[in-house]
C-alpha cells in the first residue's frame, strides 16, 4: 500500500465539498487501504479523502483504545440522527498539525454509509468515535477545524 500526502491548511482543496462515490471499484478500494495506512503512519484516528486531495465522500477511522487495529471505512457517510447531549473533546487535525482545540459536538450519532465491500450499513457511534466521524464529515463538506463554525459549537 502507498502512503498518501496529506494536504495542509490553507490548501484551497480542503474547503471544497466532496462528491458521492457512485461505484466502489478497485481504485476506491485502494484509496481506502492507502488512507488507512496514511492515517496510522501519521498517528491519526481519522482521515477524510479530501485531506489527501481526493474530493470523494470517503472516510477512514480507528478510535479503538485497546491497542488493536480496528479500522472502519465509511463511504458516503451521512448522519441520520444525533443526540441532544453534547460532549467536549480536544480535537486535532492532520491537515492543521500541532494545533488542538476543545470542540462541542453531539455525544452520539447514527450514521448511514456504505462499506468497502459495497454493503449499505447504519452504525451508532458514541464518545470519541462520534466526535471523529463528525470531524471527518466536516472535511467532506469543506469545513476545517478552527476555520468554520459548527451549529452546536457555541
Model-derived segments and spans:
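A short, hydrophobic C-terminal helix/tail in secreted or cell-surface proteins
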Residues: 149-154
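Positively charged
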Residues: 1-148
Amino acid at each position: 500500500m502507498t502512503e498518501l500526502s496529506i494536504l495542509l491548511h490553507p490548501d484551497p482543496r480542503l474547503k471544497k465539498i466532496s462528491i458521492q462515490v457512485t461505484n466502489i471499484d478497485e481504485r476506491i478500494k485502494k484509496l481506502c487501504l492507502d488512507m488507512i495506512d496514511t492515517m496510522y503512519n501519521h498517528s491519526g484516528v481519522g482521515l477524510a479523502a479530501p485531506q489527501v486531495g481526493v474530493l470523494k465522500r470517503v472516510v477512514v477511522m480507528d478510535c479503538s483504545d485497546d491497542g488493536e487495529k480496528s479500522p472502519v471505512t465509511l463511504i458516503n457517510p451521512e448522519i441520520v440522527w444525533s443526540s441532544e447531549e453534547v460532549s467536549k473533546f480536544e480535537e486535532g487535525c492532520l491537515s492543521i498539525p500541532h494545533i488542538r482545540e476543545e470542540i462541542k459536538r453531539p455525544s452520539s450519532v447514527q450514521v448511514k454509509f456504505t462499506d468497502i465491500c459495497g454493503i449499505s450499513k447504519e452504525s451508532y457511534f458514541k464518545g470519541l468515535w462520534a466526535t471523529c466521524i463528525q470531524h471527518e464529515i466536516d472535511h467532506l463538506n469543506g469545513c476545517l477545524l478552527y476555520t468554520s463554525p459548527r451549529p452546536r459549537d457555541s
